[in-house]
Amino acid sequence: MTQLATGKATPHGATYDGHGVNFTLFSAHAERVELCVFDALGNEQRYDLPGRSGDVWHGYLADARPGLRYGYRVHGPWQPAQGHRFNPAKLLIDPCARRVEGELKDNPLLHGGYDEPDHRDNAAVALKCVVTADRYDWEDDAAPRTPWGNTVIYEAHVKGLTYLHPAIPSEIRGTWKALGHPVMIAYFKQLGITALELLPVAHFASEPRLQRLGLSNYWGYNPVAMFALHPAYACSPETALDEFRDAIKALHKAGIEVILDIVLNHSAELDLDGPLFSLRGIDNRSYYWIKEDGDYHNWTGCGNTLNLSHPGVVEFACECLRYWVETCHVDGFRFDLASVMGRTPAFRQDAPLFTAINNCPVLSSVKLIAEPWDIGEGGYQVGNFPPPFAEWNDHFRDAARRFWLQRNLPLGEFAGRFAGSSDVFKRHDRLPNASVNLITAHDGFTLRDCVCFNQKHNEANGEENRDGTNNNYSDNHGKEGLGGTLDLIERRRDSIHALLTTLLLSQGTPMLLAGDEHGHSQHGNNNAYCQDNALTWLDWQQANSGLTTFTAALIHLRQQIPALVGNRWWEENDGNVRWLNKNAEPLSAGEWENGPKQMQILLSDRFLIAINATLEVTDIVLPEGEWHAIPPFAGEDNPVITAVWQGPAHGLCVFQR
């Protein structure tokens, strides 16, 4: 191979042009950057990157081809107190690599050193990047662009969703191919969801602590390479990108959007005890928030925090997001611990990354969803994200659980959450879709576990049940665990029905956790991040088909109610909503605050949700008109009701006139 030509500062990463490969690497504080390429036997050849444009180092390797394995050695000061941890003995991966080979093992050779650098070379065990070529036929693929008002999100794990599906060929279960299989497409369509939100798909690693315990990071919130797909979800690592795009193309043909859960808040380099394999050795001071003593600000709980206010890191983040949209045609993102995106270090709505996203026509036109908190001071920012972000609404989650399971929430607060939490989100010209309503998510109890367990049971995680939240607002209905008498099972079923109805018929954007429509249980584990086993995999053969039918009917019903799909704030006397007591009269101030947990919600003047959240059977006088129950509440004998509905304890029904 020849020596490197100067090359260009863009595009980011390694780019094949048909004749050779252009390499770029951002580092504001490096003194020298070596490109290291490896042959099939692992022999290494090094080249200095000859070009530097601002803080971007670059070079062009003629005759290089896709499949070339490479990494970097970056030279500069080892000054931990100042935040500099350059160590050319350690091979580093390209932060913009499209494919990474190897597994990040718990190996002391991957550590960079503490007060002094570790001079042992680690190329033999280090991760390697692989040059790729982007050739793919999207055919007539088009983004569904489902309006927010019609959007119903389904949060799922690529492997857990399909790994036990008996109708999918065993050799592709748990992969992208399974995700796009006709059986899954048909299921999504039958259920009625419009968007599939996938837990992290970018290349991730298991933390050393988990490796030592014989566990693994199942969820994927420990990113190694943010542009590269996680190889375990591919049938073949060489074709991972095409397999992923095939799945997206199939989902798009069915009108289903794909939203990626993306982790921009930290990296798998963790704290100072963690490995040095990329950002830490490339430009630690720029990429991370550094304390005065050189340690990391740990606003993520993962050991480090990316500095998304630094211009170079902002550009890195935006380029990453654009890659997933432009190259993979994804339809949006859910941002993990998204308050980090707005830290300067204080949270600001005009933070550099927010401004860059808003000014980018590619990124500002896709769905953007924030998990609106981190664990640092001032990290809880629910309601404070700028447009066009929507946000996970934990107020809704807790209120729904408290109302139906704890029975200690006033009608007024329940109604406020049902109406889209305008007290939280009706600002800065935001619409009700800004509230992403959820009862459950990957993090926490499943819906079934909410009605079967009062306490978490996380012993399998190896932390003596200390991990996971204790604030579950759950109710086991008198017996801890699954199973029980017929009466117990029926009461739990009624609670599940009430929670699902609240979720799917409320103002805002509903998000359903995959498996909740099956009755999936994690046996009380509310932090199953390290359980890559039958505890988290959906068991399709044991799925509760009746509950699935109930859920699908609710989603279909939602799409028929103008007040829910219009994505407009409800105003008094606008015909969208009326709040009534059990006698079909407007609720009084006293009833809002201290009345019995009984009410009627009239939507679009035609759809009535009658609620009896008490423990007693109650007669509820319906408003004037001829009412009949509608699916999924209609039985075989569905007479017209003109006066009174006998509301069962802890029950509800939806009528239409």
UniProtKB/Swiss-Prot annotation:
It holds the Pfam family CBM_48. The record marks D443 as: Transition state stabilizer. HAMAP family: GlgX. Gene3D superfamilies: Glycosidases (3.20.20.80), Golgi alpha-mannosidase II (2.60.40.1180), Immunoglobulins (2.60.40.10). CDD domains: AmyAc_Glg_debranch, E_set_GDE_Isoamylase_N. GO terms for biological process: glycogen catabolic process. The active site is at D336 (nucleophile), E371 (proton donor). Belongs to the glycosyl hydrolase 13 family. One of its GO terms (molecular function) is glycogen debranching enzyme activity. Keywords: Carbohydrate metabolism, Glycogen metabolism, Glycosidase, Hydrolase. It catalyses: Hydrolysis of (1->6)-alpha-D-glucosidic linkages to branches with degrees of polymerization of three or four glucose residues in limit dextrin. InterPro entries: GlgX_C (IPR040784), GlgX_Isoamylase_N_E_set (IPR044505), Glyco_hydro_13_cat_dom (IPR006047), Glyco_hydro_13_N (IPR004193), Glyco_hydro_b (IPR013780), Glycogen_debranch_bac (IPR022844), Glycogen_debranch_GlgX (IPR011837), Glycoside_hydrolase_SF (IPR017853). SUPFAM superfamilies: (Trans)glycosidases (SSF51445), E set domains (SSF81296). The lineage of its organism: Bacteria, Pseudomonadati, Pseudomonadota, Gammaproteobacteria, Enterobacterales. Residues 459-479 are annotated as: Disordered. This is Glycogen debranching enzyme.
